[in-house]
Amino acid sequence: MSLISKLRELAEVKPDHEAFVFTEYDTRSGDRTSTLTWRQVYVRASNLARYLNSLNDDLERQKFAAICAPQGIEYIVGFLGALFAGWCPVPLPEPQGGLQDKRTGLALLDCSAAVVLTTAKDEDAVRATLAAYSLAVTTPVIALDTFEVADVSPSGAGDVSDFRPPEGGMYLQYTSGSTGNPRGARISLENVEINFRQIAKAAFPYKGTEVSLPRSTVSWLPLYHDMGLMVGLFIPVYCACPSYFMSPAAFVRKPIRWMRMLAERDQPFTAAPNFAFDLATSRISDADMSGIDLAHVSAISNGGERVQPNTVDSFLERFSRYGLRPEVVKPSYGMAEAVVYVAISEVGTPPVSTEFDAQSLANGHAELKGPDAEHATRLVRYHKLDADPLVRIVDPESCVELSPGGIGEIWVHGGNLSSGYHNVDNALNKEKFHATIRDKSPGTPRSPWLRTGDLGFEWDGGFYIVGRSKDLIIQDGVNHYPDDIENTVKEFTRGRVAAFSIADERSERLVIVAEVKPTGPASGSSGVELPLVKKRAMAALSRLHGLHVADFLFVPPQALPKTTSGKISRSACAKRYLSAGFEQLEVPQ
Protein backbone atom coordinates (compact mmCIF):
# COMPACT_ATOMS: atom_id res chain seq x y z
CA MET A 1 0.00 0.00 0.00
CA SER A 2 1.34 3.44 -0.93
CA LEU A 3 2.17 6.06 1.68
CA ILE A 4 -0.79 8.19 0.54
CA SER A 5 -3.25 5.28 0.71
CA LYS A 6 -1.94 4.26 4.12
CA LEU A 7 -2.40 7.79 5.46
CA ARG A 8 -5.96 7.88 4.17
CA GLU A 9 -6.71 4.50 5.74
CA LEU A 10 -5.31 5.62 9.11
CA ALA A 11 -7.36 8.82 8.98
CA GLU A 12 -10.49 6.72 8.47
CA VAL A 13 -9.92 3.76 10.82
CA LYS A 14 -7.82 5.42 13.58
CA PRO A 15 -8.96 9.06 13.31
CA ASP A 16 -8.44 10.02 16.96
CA HIS A 17 -5.29 8.00 17.65
CA GLU A 18 -2.02 9.84 18.24
CA ALA A 19 0.02 10.13 15.05
CA PHE A 20 2.79 12.69 15.66
CA VAL A 21 3.73 13.99 19.10
CA PHE A 22 6.42 16.67 19.36
CA THR A 23 7.89 17.65 22.72
CA GLU A 24 9.46 21.09 22.99
CA TYR A 25 11.66 21.39 26.06
CA ASP A 26 12.66 24.39 28.18
CA THR A 27 10.02 26.81 26.93
CA ARG A 28 8.97 29.73 29.14
CA SER A 29 6.02 27.69 30.34
CA GLY A 30 8.05 24.50 30.77
CA ASP A 31 8.01 21.47 28.49
CA ARG A 32 5.29 21.65 25.85
CA THR A 33 3.77 18.87 23.75
CA SER A 34 2.05 19.29 20.38
CA THR A 35 -0.02 16.41 19.01
CA LEU A 36 -1.65 15.55 15.71
CA THR A 37 -4.09 12.64 15.30
CA TRP A 38 -4.23 10.70 12.05
CA ARG A 39 -7.36 12.55 10.96
CA GLN A 40 -5.83 15.93 11.81
CA VAL A 41 -2.71 15.11 9.79
CA TYR A 42 -4.76 14.14 6.75
CA VAL A 43 -7.11 17.13 6.91
CA ARG A 44 -4.36 19.69 7.53
CA ALA A 45 -2.23 18.27 4.71
CA SER A 46 -5.29 18.29 2.42
CA ASN A 47 -6.05 21.93 3.24
CA LEU A 48 -2.48 22.94 2.48
CA ALA A 49 -2.59 20.96 -0.77
CA ARG A 50 -5.71 22.80 -1.91
CA TYR A 51 -4.04 26.12 -1.20
CA LEU A 52 -0.83 25.18 -3.01
CA ASN A 53 -2.78 24.14 -6.07
CA SER A 54 -4.62 27.47 -6.04
CA LEU A 55 -1.30 29.32 -6.39
CA ASN A 56 -0.43 28.07 -9.85
CA ASP A 57 -2.41 26.36 -12.59
CA ASP A 58 0.69 25.28 -14.53
CA LEU A 59 0.30 21.50 -14.43
CA GLU A 60 2.98 20.83 -17.03
CA ARG A 61 5.96 21.73 -14.86
CA GLN A 62 7.11 19.85 -11.76
CA LYS A 63 6.68 22.24 -8.83
CA PHE A 64 8.99 22.14 -5.85
CA ALA A 65 7.91 23.12 -2.34
CA ALA A 66 10.85 23.69 -0.01
CA ILE A 67 10.24 23.09 3.69
CA CYS A 68 12.54 25.36 5.73
CA ALA A 69 10.96 25.03 9.15
CA PRO A 70 12.08 24.10 12.66
CA GLN A 71 11.55 20.61 14.02
CA GLY A 72 7.88 20.16 14.85
CA ILE A 73 4.48 19.04 13.62
CA GLU A 74 4.39 21.88 11.06
CA TYR A 75 7.26 20.19 9.24
CA ILE A 76 5.17 17.01 8.92
CA VAL A 77 2.17 18.96 7.61
CA GLY A 78 4.32 20.88 5.12
CA PHE A 79 5.94 17.75 3.70
CA LEU A 80 2.68 15.82 3.37
CA GLY A 81 0.73 18.83 2.11
CA ALA A 82 3.18 19.24 -0.77
CA LEU A 83 2.87 15.53 -1.61
CA PHE A 84 -0.93 15.72 -1.43
CA ALA A 85 -0.86 18.61 -3.90
CA GLY A 86 1.17 16.57 -6.36
CA TRP A 87 4.14 18.85 -5.77
CA CYS A 88 7.65 17.71 -4.93
CA PRO A 89 8.61 18.43 -1.29
CA VAL A 90 12.20 19.48 -0.61
CA PRO A 91 13.06 19.01 3.10
CA LEU A 92 15.68 21.55 4.21
CA PRO A 93 16.91 23.05 7.51
CA GLU A 94 15.47 26.26 8.91
CA PRO A 95 17.73 29.32 8.46
CA GLN A 96 20.14 29.57 11.39
CA GLY A 97 23.15 31.39 9.96
CA GLY A 98 26.53 30.06 8.87
CA LEU A 99 27.47 27.22 6.55
CA GLN A 100 24.12 25.45 6.90
CA ASP A 101 22.31 28.46 5.41
CA LYS A 102 24.67 28.34 2.44
CA ARG A 103 23.65 24.74 1.76
CA THR A 104 19.99 25.69 2.11
CA GLY A 105 20.45 28.59 -0.30
CA LEU A 106 22.23 26.39 -2.84
CA ALA A 107 19.44 23.80 -2.59
CA LEU A 108 16.73 26.45 -3.06
CA LEU A 109 18.61 27.70 -6.10
CA ASP A 110 19.12 24.19 -7.46
CA CYS A 111 15.45 23.17 -7.24
CA SER A 112 13.98 26.58 -8.18
CA ALA A 113 11.48 26.33 -5.34
CA ALA A 114 8.02 27.62 -6.32
CA VAL A 115 7.06 28.07 -2.67
CA VAL A 116 8.80 27.92 0.71
CA LEU A 117 6.97 26.47 3.71
CA THR A 118 8.22 27.72 7.07
CA THR A 119 6.95 29.16 10.37
CA ALA A 120 6.18 32.73 11.38
CA LYS A 121 9.39 33.17 13.37
CA ASP A 122 11.55 32.10 10.40
CA GLU A 123 9.66 33.96 7.67
CA ASP A 124 12.02 36.97 7.54
CA ALA A 125 15.11 34.75 7.60
CA VAL A 126 13.74 32.68 4.72
CA ARG A 127 13.08 35.81 2.66
CA ALA A 128 16.62 37.00 3.40
CA THR A 129 18.01 33.66 2.18
CA LEU A 130 15.95 33.90 -1.00
CA ALA A 131 17.27 37.41 -1.62
CA ALA A 132 20.87 36.39 -0.90
CA TYR A 133 20.71 33.80 -3.68
CA SER A 134 18.92 36.09 -6.15
CA LEU A 135 15.77 33.99 -6.07
CA ALA A 136 12.49 35.57 -7.03
CA VAL A 137 11.28 38.00 -4.39
CA THR A 138 7.77 37.01 -5.45
CA THR A 139 8.29 33.40 -4.33
CA PRO A 140 5.44 32.71 -1.87
CA VAL A 141 6.56 32.07 1.71
CA ILE A 142 3.89 30.35 3.80
CA ALA A 143 4.00 30.27 7.61
CA LEU A 144 2.56 26.85 8.42
CA ASP A 145 1.82 27.64 12.06
CA THR A 146 -0.42 30.58 11.15
CA PHE A 147 -1.93 29.07 7.99
CA GLU A 148 -5.69 29.07 8.45
CA VAL A 149 -8.34 26.82 6.98
CA ALA A 150 -10.02 30.01 5.77
CA ASP A 151 -7.06 30.52 3.43
CA VAL A 152 -8.35 27.58 1.39
CA SER A 153 -10.72 28.90 -1.22
CA PRO A 154 -13.17 28.21 -2.73
CA SER A 155 -13.29 24.50 -1.78
CA GLY A 156 -12.88 25.01 1.94
CA ALA A 157 -11.90 22.36 4.45
CA GLY A 158 -13.84 19.21 4.98
CA ASP A 159 -13.72 15.60 6.03
CA VAL A 160 -11.23 12.95 4.95
CA SER A 161 -13.49 11.84 2.11
CA ASP A 162 -13.46 15.34 0.58
CA PHE A 163 -9.91 15.15 -0.74
CA ARG A 164 -8.13 12.43 -2.69
CA PRO A 165 -4.47 13.23 -3.33
CA PRO A 166 -2.57 11.58 -6.18
CA GLU A 167 -1.11 8.17 -5.30
CA GLY A 168 2.35 8.65 -6.80
CA GLY A 169 4.83 11.32 -5.97
CA MET A 170 8.43 12.05 -5.21
CA TYR A 171 10.59 14.33 -3.10
CA LEU A 172 14.11 15.69 -3.34
CA GLN A 173 16.46 14.50 -0.61
CA TYR A 174 19.57 16.63 -0.60
CA THR A 175 22.74 14.79 0.33
CA SER A 176 24.66 15.91 3.40
CA GLY A 177 27.47 17.36 1.30
CA SER A 178 30.29 15.69 3.25
CA THR A 179 32.55 15.68 0.17
CA GLY A 180 31.17 18.67 -1.77
CA ASN A 181 28.04 20.68 -2.47
CA PRO A 182 24.78 18.87 -1.69
CA ARG A 183 22.80 17.30 -4.54
CA GLY A 184 19.10 16.53 -4.62
CA ALA A 185 18.38 12.81 -5.04
CA ARG A 186 15.01 12.11 -6.64
CA ILE A 187 13.16 9.74 -4.30
CA SER A 188 9.82 8.26 -5.35
CA LEU A 189 7.19 7.05 -2.90
CA GLU A 190 7.70 3.59 -4.41
CA ASN A 191 11.38 3.82 -3.37
CA VAL A 192 10.21 4.69 0.16
CA GLU A 193 7.78 1.77 0.37
CA ILE A 194 10.44 -0.69 -0.82
CA ASN A 195 13.03 0.69 1.61
CA PHE A 196 10.57 0.37 4.50
CA ARG A 197 10.03 -3.31 3.65
CA GLN A 198 13.80 -3.83 3.47
CA ILE A 199 14.25 -2.20 6.89
CA ALA A 200 11.38 -4.19 8.43
CA LYS A 201 12.83 -7.48 7.20
CA ALA A 202 16.39 -6.71 8.33
CA ALA A 203 16.13 -4.51 11.43
CA PHE A 204 12.97 -5.42 13.34
CA PRO A 205 12.76 -8.48 15.61
CA TYR A 206 10.91 -11.64 14.60
CA LYS A 207 8.22 -13.67 16.33
CA GLY A 208 8.69 -17.05 14.72
CA THR A 209 8.75 -16.30 10.99
CA GLU A 210 6.79 -13.05 11.26
CA VAL A 211 8.33 -9.58 11.57
CA SER A 212 7.32 -7.88 14.82
CA LEU A 213 6.76 -4.24 13.87
CA PRO A 214 7.50 -1.52 16.42
CA ARG A 215 4.52 0.02 18.20
CA SER A 216 6.07 3.48 18.30
CA THR A 217 9.08 5.42 17.04
CA VAL A 218 11.28 7.82 19.00
CA SER A 219 13.50 10.37 17.28
CA TRP A 220 15.45 13.58 17.72
CA LEU A 221 16.92 13.44 14.21
CA PRO A 222 16.09 16.45 12.01
CA LEU A 223 13.22 15.79 9.63
CA TYR A 224 15.21 17.21 6.73
CA HIS A 225 17.69 14.34 7.14
CA ASP A 226 17.04 11.03 5.35
CA MET A 227 17.16 8.97 8.55
CA GLY A 228 15.05 11.51 10.44
CA LEU A 229 12.38 11.41 7.73
CA MET A 230 12.28 7.60 7.77
CA VAL A 231 12.12 7.24 11.57
CA GLY A 232 9.98 10.30 12.26
CA LEU A 233 7.47 10.05 9.40
CA PHE A 234 7.60 7.05 7.06
CA ILE A 235 7.96 4.17 9.54
CA PRO A 236 5.13 5.48 11.78
CA VAL A 237 2.79 5.62 8.78
CA TYR A 238 3.62 2.14 7.52
CA CYS A 239 3.56 0.65 11.03
CA ALA A 240 0.40 2.59 11.97
CA CYS A 241 2.12 3.67 15.16
CA PRO A 242 2.69 7.04 16.85
CA SER A 243 5.86 9.06 16.26
CA TYR A 244 7.33 10.75 19.35
CA PHE A 245 10.04 13.26 18.57
CA MET A 246 12.04 16.23 19.82
CA SER A 247 14.60 18.62 18.35
CA PRO A 248 18.28 17.71 17.90
CA ALA A 249 19.20 20.54 20.28
CA ALA A 250 16.96 19.09 22.99
CA PHE A 251 18.86 15.81 22.78
CA VAL A 252 22.32 17.40 22.73
CA ARG A 253 21.51 19.55 25.77
CA LYS A 254 20.24 16.58 27.77
CA PRO A 255 20.85 13.14 26.17
CA ILE A 256 18.84 11.50 28.96
CA ARG A 257 15.70 12.76 27.20
CA TRP A 258 16.30 10.17 24.47
CA MET A 259 16.48 7.31 26.98
CA ARG A 260 13.44 8.55 28.92
CA MET A 261 11.35 8.80 25.78
CA LEU A 262 12.37 5.26 24.80
CA ALA A 263 11.46 3.98 28.26
CA GLU A 264 8.05 5.69 28.20
CA ARG A 265 6.92 4.33 24.83
CA ASP A 266 5.59 0.97 23.67
CA GLN A 267 8.17 -1.22 21.85
CA PRO A 268 9.88 1.77 20.24
CA PHE A 269 12.25 1.90 17.27
CA THR A 270 14.87 4.64 17.14
CA ALA A 271 17.99 5.57 15.19
CA ALA A 272 20.92 7.95 15.54
CA PRO A 273 24.45 8.55 14.21
CA ASN A 274 27.50 7.18 16.01
CA PHE A 275 28.33 10.40 17.89
CA ALA A 276 24.96 10.25 19.69
CA PHE A 277 25.84 6.90 21.24
CA ASP A 278 29.12 8.37 22.51
CA LEU A 279 27.23 11.34 23.90
CA ALA A 280 24.66 9.17 25.65
CA THR A 281 27.36 6.95 27.16
CA SER A 282 29.47 9.83 28.49
CA ARG A 283 26.78 12.31 29.53
CA ILE A 284 24.06 10.15 31.12
CA SER A 285 24.64 9.34 34.79
CA ASP A 286 23.31 6.50 36.93
CA ALA A 287 21.15 9.05 38.73
CA ASP A 288 19.67 10.11 35.37
CA MET A 289 18.81 6.48 34.61
CA SER A 290 17.08 5.83 37.93
CA GLY A 291 13.84 3.95 37.29
CA ILE A 292 14.43 3.62 33.53
CA ASP A 293 13.90 0.21 31.89
CA LEU A 294 14.96 -0.36 28.26
CA ALA A 295 14.08 -4.06 28.05
CA HIS A 296 11.10 -3.44 25.76
CA VAL A 297 12.98 -1.43 23.09
CA SER A 298 12.37 -2.94 19.64
CA ALA A 299 15.55 -1.81 17.85
CA ILE A 300 18.15 0.98 17.90
CA SER A 301 19.90 1.68 14.60
CA ASN A 302 23.37 3.24 14.65
CA GLY A 303 23.95 4.82 11.23
CA GLY A 304 24.43 8.04 9.30
CA GLU A 305 28.20 8.03 9.82
CA ARG A 306 30.87 5.38 10.22
CA VAL A 307 30.03 3.12 13.16
CA GLN A 308 32.88 2.72 15.66
CA PRO A 309 33.13 -0.68 17.42
CA ASN A 310 34.35 0.93 20.65
CA THR A 311 31.27 3.14 20.67
CA VAL A 312 28.96 0.15 20.28
CA ASP A 313 30.75 -1.76 23.04
CA SER A 314 30.67 1.17 25.46
CA PHE A 315 26.98 1.88 24.78
CA LEU A 316 25.99 -1.73 25.40
CA GLU A 317 28.12 -1.96 28.52
CA ARG A 318 26.61 1.27 29.85
CA PHE A 319 22.94 0.53 29.22
CA SER A 320 22.69 -3.27 29.41
CA ARG A 321 22.29 -2.89 33.19
CA TYR A 322 19.01 -1.09 32.41
CA GLY A 323 17.63 -3.98 30.39
CA LEU A 324 18.95 -3.09 26.92
CA ARG A 325 19.49 -6.32 24.98
CA PRO A 326 22.65 -6.56 22.79
CA GLU A 327 20.77 -7.76 19.70
CA VAL A 328 18.63 -4.60 19.78
CA VAL A 329 21.57 -2.33 18.81
CA LYS A 330 21.96 -2.47 15.03
CA PRO A 331 24.95 -0.90 13.23
CA SER A 332 23.63 0.20 9.84
CA TYR A 333 24.82 1.65 6.55
CA GLY A 334 22.92 3.82 4.13
CA MET A 335 22.70 7.03 2.14
CA ALA A 336 20.20 9.55 0.76
CA GLU A 337 20.45 8.03 -2.75
CA ALA A 338 18.96 4.79 -1.34
CA VAL A 339 16.17 6.59 0.62
CA VAL A 340 18.23 5.81 3.73
CA TYR A 341 18.90 2.09 4.28
CA VAL A 342 21.37 -0.23 2.52
CA ALA A 343 22.67 -2.71 5.10
CA ILE A 344 22.60 -3.61 8.77
CA SER A 345 24.06 -6.16 11.17
CA GLU A 346 22.56 -9.66 11.11
CA VAL A 347 19.04 -10.14 12.48
CA GLY A 348 18.72 -11.45 16.03
CA THR A 349 22.42 -11.30 16.88
CA PRO A 350 24.55 -8.79 18.81
CA PRO A 351 26.77 -6.48 16.74
CA VAL A 352 29.93 -8.18 15.42
CA SER A 353 33.31 -6.55 14.84
CA THR A 354 36.55 -8.04 13.52
CA GLU A 355 40.21 -7.04 13.84
CA PHE A 356 42.11 -6.71 10.57
CA ASP A 357 45.78 -6.05 9.96
CA ALA A 358 46.13 -2.29 9.52
CA GLN A 359 49.08 -2.51 7.13
CA SER A 360 47.23 -4.92 4.86
CA LEU A 361 44.24 -2.58 4.73
CA ALA A 362 46.58 0.28 3.79
CA ASN A 363 47.93 -1.89 0.97
CA GLY A 364 44.43 -2.47 -0.42
CA HIS A 365 43.65 -5.98 0.82
CA ALA A 366 42.09 -7.24 4.05
CA GLU A 367 43.79 -9.81 6.24
CA LEU A 368 42.91 -10.86 9.75
CA LYS A 369 45.17 -9.52 12.46
CA GLY A 370 48.08 -11.89 12.97
CA PRO A 371 49.94 -12.53 16.23
CA ASP A 372 52.85 -10.37 15.06
CA ALA A 373 50.77 -7.48 13.70
CA GLU A 374 51.88 -4.16 15.19
CA HIS A 375 48.54 -2.45 14.69
CA ALA A 376 45.02 -3.72 14.07
CA THR A 377 41.94 -1.94 12.80
CA ARG A 378 38.63 -3.14 14.23
CA LEU A 379 35.68 -2.83 11.87
CA VAL A 380 31.94 -3.47 12.20
CA ARG A 381 30.44 -6.28 10.14
CA TYR A 382 27.32 -5.77 8.00
CA HIS A 383 24.98 -8.45 6.72
CA LYS A 384 25.47 -10.76 3.76
CA LEU A 385 25.97 -9.22 0.34
CA ASP A 386 22.97 -11.11 -1.11
CA ALA A 387 20.46 -9.48 1.23
CA ASP A 388 17.99 -6.90 -0.13
CA PRO A 389 19.29 -4.56 -1.51
CA LEU A 390 22.24 -6.34 -3.10
CA VAL A 391 25.76 -5.17 -2.29
CA ARG A 392 28.91 -5.89 -4.28
CA ILE A 393 32.55 -4.80 -3.93
CA VAL A 394 33.86 -3.57 -7.29
CA ASP A 395 37.14 -2.22 -8.60
CA PRO A 396 36.24 1.43 -9.29
CA GLU A 397 38.55 1.67 -12.31
CA SER A 398 37.96 -1.63 -14.13
CA CYS A 399 34.36 -2.15 -12.86
CA VAL A 400 35.24 -5.79 -12.15
CA GLU A 401 33.77 -7.51 -9.08
CA LEU A 402 36.45 -8.22 -6.49
CA SER A 403 37.03 -11.44 -4.61
CA PRO A 404 36.73 -11.55 -0.80
CA GLY A 405 39.33 -9.39 0.92
CA GLY A 406 39.86 -7.04 -1.99
CA ILE A 407 39.17 -3.41 -1.09
CA GLY A 408 37.04 -1.65 -3.66
CA GLU A 409 34.00 0.57 -4.10
CA ILE A 410 30.69 -0.50 -2.57
CA TRP A 411 27.99 -0.84 -5.26
CA VAL A 412 24.27 -1.26 -4.49
CA HIS A 413 21.36 -2.69 -6.52
CA GLY A 414 17.70 -2.54 -5.43
CA GLY A 415 14.27 -1.01 -5.86
CA ASN A 416 14.94 1.58 -3.16
CA LEU A 417 17.53 3.45 -5.24
CA SER A 418 16.96 6.96 -6.55
CA SER A 419 16.60 7.45 -10.30
CA GLY A 420 19.28 10.16 -10.13
CA TYR A 421 20.11 13.67 -9.02
CA HIS A 422 17.93 16.61 -9.92
CA ASN A 423 19.38 19.22 -12.25
CA VAL A 424 22.51 17.18 -12.99
CA ASP A 425 24.00 16.17 -16.33
CA ASN A 426 22.59 12.86 -17.63
CA ALA A 427 26.09 11.47 -18.15
CA LEU A 428 26.92 11.95 -14.47
CA ASN A 429 23.64 10.35 -13.38
CA LYS A 430 24.28 7.41 -15.69
CA GLU A 431 27.77 6.92 -14.27
CA LYS A 432 26.54 7.22 -10.66
CA PHE A 433 23.18 5.41 -10.71
CA HIS A 434 23.37 3.09 -13.73
CA ALA A 435 26.83 1.56 -13.46
CA THR A 436 27.56 -1.84 -15.04
CA ILE A 437 29.70 -4.64 -13.59
CA ARG A 438 31.91 -5.97 -16.40
CA ASP A 439 33.07 -9.21 -14.79
CA LYS A 440 30.49 -10.44 -12.30
CA SER A 441 29.84 -13.45 -10.10
CA PRO A 442 26.98 -15.89 -10.91
CA GLY A 443 23.57 -14.49 -9.98
CA THR A 444 24.80 -10.90 -9.88
CA PRO A 445 22.85 -8.45 -12.09
CA ARG A 446 24.99 -6.67 -14.64
CA SER A 447 23.20 -3.34 -14.07
CA PRO A 448 21.97 -0.89 -12.88
CA TRP A 449 24.23 -0.35 -9.87
CA LEU A 450 24.63 2.68 -7.63
CA ARG A 451 28.26 3.69 -7.11
CA THR A 452 28.34 4.82 -3.49
CA GLY A 453 31.85 6.32 -3.36
CA ASP A 454 32.45 4.30 -0.19
CA LEU A 455 35.26 1.76 0.11
CA GLY A 456 34.87 -1.67 1.65
CA PHE A 457 35.52 -5.38 1.28
CA GLU A 458 33.77 -8.72 1.54
CA TRP A 459 34.78 -11.13 4.28
CA ASP A 460 33.23 -14.40 5.40
CA GLY A 461 29.91 -13.68 3.68
CA GLY A 462 29.45 -10.20 5.14
CA PHE A 463 31.10 -6.91 4.31
CA TYR A 464 33.04 -4.15 6.05
CA ILE A 465 33.38 -0.42 5.35
CA VAL A 466 36.75 1.35 5.49
CA GLY A 467 36.03 4.91 4.30
CA ARG A 468 35.14 7.34 1.50
CA SER A 469 37.13 7.20 -1.72
CA LYS A 470 37.15 11.01 -2.00
CA ASP A 471 38.54 11.32 1.53
CA LEU A 472 41.30 8.75 1.04
CA ILE A 473 44.74 10.03 2.07
CA ILE A 474 47.71 8.67 0.11
CA GLN A 475 51.19 9.13 1.56
CA ASP A 476 54.29 7.45 0.13
CA GLY A 477 52.07 5.30 -2.06
CA VAL A 478 50.11 3.90 0.90
CA ASN A 479 46.35 4.37 1.41
CA HIS A 480 45.19 5.77 4.74
CA TYR A 481 41.56 6.11 5.83
CA PRO A 482 40.76 9.38 7.65
CA ASP A 483 38.39 7.69 10.11
CA ASP A 484 41.26 5.56 11.42
CA ILE A 485 43.56 8.59 11.67
CA GLU A 486 40.89 10.62 13.47
CA ASN A 487 40.18 7.81 15.94
CA THR A 488 43.87 7.64 16.85
CA VAL A 489 44.01 11.40 17.47
CA LYS A 490 40.76 11.34 19.50
CA GLU A 491 42.42 9.02 22.00
CA PHE A 492 44.48 12.04 23.05
CA THR A 493 42.31 15.09 22.28
CA ARG A 494 38.91 13.66 23.38
CA GLY A 495 37.08 15.87 20.90
CA ARG A 496 36.05 15.96 17.25
CA VAL A 497 38.87 15.66 14.72
CA ALA A 498 39.22 16.21 10.97
CA ALA A 499 42.03 14.57 9.00
CA PHE A 500 42.48 15.64 5.38
CA SER A 501 45.20 16.10 2.80
CA ILE A 502 46.37 19.16 0.92
CA ALA A 503 48.16 18.52 -2.36
CA ASP A 504 51.35 20.37 -3.25
CA GLU A 505 53.63 20.03 -6.27
CA ARG A 506 55.35 16.94 -4.87
CA SER A 507 52.97 15.03 -2.61
CA GLU A 508 49.94 15.09 -0.31
CA ARG A 509 50.38 16.88 3.01
CA LEU A 510 48.40 15.52 5.96
CA VAL A 511 46.63 18.13 8.09
CA ILE A 512 44.98 17.44 11.45
CA VAL A 513 42.47 19.87 12.99
CA ALA A 514 41.30 18.90 16.48
CA GLU A 515 38.62 20.47 18.66
CA VAL A 516 39.48 20.84 22.33
CA LYS A 517 37.57 22.38 25.21
CA PRO A 518 38.81 25.72 26.56
CA THR A 519 39.24 24.23 30.05
CA GLY A 520 40.07 20.77 31.29
CA PRO A 521 43.00 18.37 31.50
CA ALA A 522 43.47 17.99 27.73
CA SER A 523 42.78 21.56 26.76
CA GLY A 524 45.94 23.44 27.49
CA SER A 525 44.42 25.48 30.30
CA SER A 526 47.76 25.47 32.10
CA GLY A 527 49.71 26.19 28.93
CA VAL A 528 51.43 22.79 29.17
CA GLU A 529 48.97 20.08 28.13
CA LEU A 530 48.36 21.01 24.48
CA PRO A 531 52.00 20.59 23.41
CA LEU A 532 52.08 17.22 25.18
CA VAL A 533 48.79 16.11 23.59
CA LYS A 534 50.07 17.13 20.16
CA LYS A 535 53.40 15.36 20.67
CA ARG A 536 51.74 12.13 21.79
CA ALA A 537 49.14 12.18 19.01
CA MET A 538 51.76 12.76 16.30
CA ALA A 539 53.96 10.02 17.75
CA ALA A 540 51.00 7.61 17.65
CA LEU A 541 50.26 8.53 14.02
CA SER A 542 53.88 7.84 13.12
CA ARG A 543 54.08 4.58 15.07
CA LEU A 544 50.66 3.10 14.24
CA HIS A 545 50.07 4.45 10.74
CA GLY A 546 53.53 5.38 9.47
CA LEU A 547 52.30 8.92 8.82
CA HIS A 548 54.05 12.27 8.80
CA VAL A 549 51.82 15.19 9.82
CA ALA A 550 52.48 18.46 7.97
CA ASP A 551 50.30 20.60 10.25
CA PHE A 552 48.40 19.99 13.49
CA LEU A 553 45.90 22.63 14.67
CA PHE A 554 43.85 22.96 17.85
CA VAL A 555 40.55 24.81 17.51
CA PRO A 556 37.65 25.57 19.90
CA PRO A 557 34.60 23.28 20.15
CA GLN A 558 32.14 23.49 17.23
CA ALA A 559 34.79 25.05 14.97
CA LEU A 560 34.88 22.17 12.49
CA PRO A 561 32.35 22.65 9.68
CA LYS A 562 29.68 19.97 9.59
CA THR A 563 27.19 18.68 7.06
CA THR A 564 23.43 19.01 7.55
CA SER A 565 23.46 15.53 9.10
CA GLY A 566 26.09 16.46 11.68
CA LYS A 567 29.08 14.76 10.07
CA ILE A 568 32.42 16.54 9.77
CA SER A 569 32.78 17.92 6.24
CA ARG A 570 36.43 17.24 5.42
CA SER A 571 36.21 19.09 2.11
CA ALA A 572 34.90 22.20 3.91
CA CYS A 573 37.66 21.80 6.51
CA ALA A 574 40.27 21.77 3.76
CA LYS A 575 38.82 24.90 2.17
CA ARG A 576 38.74 26.72 5.50
CA TYR A 577 42.30 25.66 6.26
CA LEU A 578 43.58 26.91 2.90
CA SER A 579 41.89 30.26 3.46
CA ALA A 580 43.34 30.52 7.00
CA GLY A 581 39.78 30.53 8.31
CA PHE A 582 40.30 28.54 11.51
CA GLU A 583 40.59 30.35 14.83
CA GLN A 584 43.54 28.47 16.30
CA LEU A 585 44.24 27.94 19.97
CA GLU A 586 47.77 28.94 20.84
CA VAL A 587 50.16 26.11 21.60
CA PRO A 588 53.13 27.17 23.74
CA GLN A 589 56.46 26.10 22.25
Curated annotation (Swiss-Prot):
Pfam families: AMP-binding (PF00501), AMP-dom_DIP2-like (PF23024). Keywords: ATP-binding, Fatty acid metabolism, Ligase, Lipid metabolism, Nucleotide-binding. It comes from the Bacteria. One of its GO terms (biological process) is fatty acid biosynthetic process. CDD domains: FAAL. Pathway: Lipid metabolism; fatty acid biosynthesis. SUPFAM superfamilies: Acetyl-CoA synthetase-like. One of its GO terms (molecular function) is ATP binding. Signal peptide: none annotated. One of its GO terms (cellular component) is plasma membrane. Its EC number is 6.2.1.-. InterPro entries: AMP-bd_C, AMP-bd_C_sf, AMP-binding_CS, AMP-dep_synth/lig_dom, ANL_N_sf, FAAL/FAAC. The keyword Nucleotide-binding applies. It is an enzyme of class 6 (ligase). Belongs to the ATP-dependent AMP-binding enzyme family. Catalyzes the activation of long-chain fatty acids as acyl-adenylates (acyl-AMP), which are then transferred to a multifunctional polyketide synthase (PKS) for further chain extension. PANTHER family: DISCO-INTERACTING PROTEIN 2, DISCO-INTERACTING PROTEIN 2 DIP2 -RELATED. This is Probable long-chain-fatty-acid--AMP ligase FadD30. It comes from Mycobacterium marinum (strain ATCC BAA-535 / M). The gene is fadD30.
